[in-house]
Amino acid sequence: MKKVLKWTAYVLGSLILFIMLASWYFSSKFNKEFEKVIDYTPDAIIIPTDSASVDRGRVLSVSCRSCHSVDLGGKVFFNDPSIGTLPASNLTRDKGSETEHYTDQDFVKAIRHGLNKSGNKLMIMPCKSYSHMSDADLGSLIAFLNTLPKVERTFDKRKFTFMSQVMAGAGLFGDMFHYDLIDHDNVKNIPSVIVGNTVEYGSYLAHVQGCNDCHKKDFKGGKSPDPVSPPVPDISQTGSVGKWTSEQFIQTFRTGSTPEGKVLNGEFMPFSGLAAHTDQEITAVYNYIKSLK
């Protein structure tokens, strides 16, 4: 009996030690990535000043509101005692904000490459999607940001519980740093795609909007990259969208309700970004999805 107890204590002790070491390793791994400074200077792009370009930037910026608030003055992205606190930055260059001293090139670095002004990796920022954005559209987006009135809003620094650091380091929160997912040498001098209801433009817009980040490459959905979010629906030919007309697809984004009567939850399905575009552009995304086999 003593021998059994001895071995049981040995196994339990080893297991506890393993868990402690693994937790320390994953926590350290996360913090190392979080604190790493990357020396990277992106290629400069042309920032237009004409009203048409600024308005195009306004349309593109609607996608940013889900995280950065309607006025783009930032907001607390999440605040959970079990996970921690993470604010989404104030993008208006207000005094004391993370973007106060941002240049146009710093915004290119952040939006296209996932790095802040200091060279730290941005968390949860969907830069992989924005890395598909053409130079012209990215320039228009930054041109619009340059017109924003400053919003006086500051936040406490981001902080994470030890357990959330362990989970993030173990990859349980999905891809936290999109910088690591981007081929930085190939996201430069990106040509524009002619706006129209074509499959080509639909592919461009779907990738910029990040549809495939959640709905997967084949748009068949599945498990969400966010462990606390519900499963992602199939929007390919084999899903409900495959049965919709282009008009129904457009109305879904315009009203936030599907033909089947399901109300879209903007927290998990940020449909407002695509809804800001014209019927022709939304039709292009529909045509692109319908073209997938």
Where are these regions (language model features)?
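Electrostatic cytochrome c docking/interface patches
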Residues: 35-61, 174-207
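The canonical Cys-X-X-Cys-His
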Residues: 57, 61-70, 107, 141, ...
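Detector for the c-type heme attachment site
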Residues: 67-73, 112-113, 146, 214-220, ...
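N-terminal type II signal-anchor transmembrane helix
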Residues: 2-36
